[in-house]
């Protein structure tokens, strides 16, 4: 991507619509993801379930691991940086990743400021729990939004909450008179121009994917029914009993989310799903979705 204009960045993200992006930690996993039909992979040293289990500070992955994954597949490769850590983003841009995820899954580097994403040619995806968060990230230059969900839990409830909240707030914006939009923009802390765009178009100005806790084909199809453009699957595939089969099943579930017969077929005989976490058991400081603002 020679030109880093916003239209080119958002156009690139549009190409992922209707697809599945999978977390991978090795070139072998990346090949499994590509063969299963993933539209892109997210290169990581540890999947969110392991980051959650091991604790400590989670940082950008070793560039060597990311480069090995990039060499193994022909589909786009994404990688994560800490919230606010623009130097990690500079490193990823230098090694040629296709997309950067400024991610709450990693330990935030800055608790007040997100990265100024306009300064980069490479496009960014960011998490959001509601319309205000989404529009702030887009104002900073994000070319793609995803729900935050609660990564590494295998529990889809937070992703569902964030998706429903986003659409509820979009519908509310549409119900406002034009002379009420400025006050609402102030209330949610988002630029007026973006609030007006949402009012006029009834959706976000960029692609919006589901992420965080998606573990089964049914979970993935549920998020598509809730109006998402596609799905990120993290720990749910390679922490399960039969990753190859589950990866293929989730890709088919997203493509055929409206066909219960296909969903029933792809949900059969997938082996053990990842062990999930009931969110009631999480301490407040263990919740990743509240990172960022």
Curated annotation (Swiss-Prot):
Positions contributing to D-ribose 5-phosphate binding: 23, 152, 213, 234-235
EC number, UniProt record: 4.3.3.6
Reactions accelerated catalytically: aldehydo-D-ribose 5-phosphate + D-glyceraldehyde 3-phosphate + L-glutamine = pyridoxal 5'-phosphate + L-glutamate + phosphate + 3 H2O + H(+)
InterPro entries membership: Aldolase_TIM (IPR013785), PdxS/SNZ (IPR001852), PdxS/SNZ_N (IPR033755), RibuloseP-bd_barrel (IPR011060)
UniProt keywords, alphabetically: Lyase, Pyridoxal phosphate, Schiff base
Pathway this chain belongs to: Cofactor biosynthesis; pyridoxal 5'-phosphate biosynthesis
Presence of keyword Mitochondrion: no
Enzyme class, first EC level, given as a word: lyase
Residues the record lists as binding D-glyceraldehyde 3-phosphate: 164
Catalytic residues of the enzyme: 80
A biological-process GO annotation: amino acid metabolic process
Domain of life: Bacteria
Quaternary organization: In the presence of PdxT, forms a dodecamer of heterodimers.
Family: Belongs to the PdxS/SNZ family.
NCBIfam families named in the record: PRK04180.1, pyridoxal 5'-phosphate synthase lyase subunit PdxS
Protein name: Pyridoxal 5'-phosphate synthase subunit PdxS
The organism's taxonomic lineage, starting at the top: Bacteria, Thermotogati, Deinococcota, Deinococci, Thermales
Gene (name only): pdxS
